[in-house]
Amino acid sequence: MSKITADDVRKVAKLARLDLPEDTIATYTGQLERILDYVDQLQAVDTEGVPPTTRAVEVVNATREDSVVATDVRQELLDQAPQREGDFFRVPKILAD
């Protein structure tokens, strides 16, 4: 692994459109160096025979049987509308003619 320089950090910051104060460049240089060293360690791990995964915990969809439930709340909903016209909600016009 090549050494990360202050110029490398400035370049990455510029690409990310970050304005880093000059007094923080040394800190970020060391942090980026450690991050990339860790990535090198991960690259060296033998993963032969390990199945690929996309998440740590299996996701299970909780499903239920659909069922029809008779409801008659139409009038209740219409009564709550701030403005209505017959059996329709009246809303402000948003598109020009």
From Swiss-Prot:
Report the Pfam families cross-referenced here: GatC (PF02686)
Q: Which domain of life is it from?
A: Bacteria
* Protein keywords: ATP-binding, Ligase, Nucleotide-binding, Protein biosynthesis
Q: Which reaction does it catalyse?
A: L-glutamyl-tRNA(Gln) + L-glutamine + ATP + H2O = L-glutaminyl-tRNA(Gln) + L-glutamate + ADP + phosphate + H(+); L-aspartyl-tRNA(Asn) + L-glutamine + ATP + H2O = L-asparaginyl-tRNA(Asn) + L-glutamate + ADP + phosphate + 2 H(+)
One biological process GO term for this chain?
Answer: glutaminyl-tRNAGln biosynthesis via transamidation
Q: State what this protein does.
A: Allows the formation of correctly charged Asn-tRNA(Asn) or Gln-tRNA(Gln) through the transamidation of misacylated Asp-tRNA(Asn) or Glu-tRNA(Gln) in organisms which lack either or both of asparaginyl-tRNA or glutaminyl-tRNA synthetases. The reaction takes place in the presence of glutamine and ATP through an activated phospho-Asp-tRNA(Asn) or phospho-Glu-tRNA(Gln).
Q: Which family does it belong to?
A: Belongs to the GatC family.
Q: How does it assemble?
A: Heterotrimer of A, B and C subunits.
In Swiss-Prot or TrEMBL terms, this protein is called: Aspartyl/glutamyl-tRNA(Asn/Gln) amidotransferase subunit C
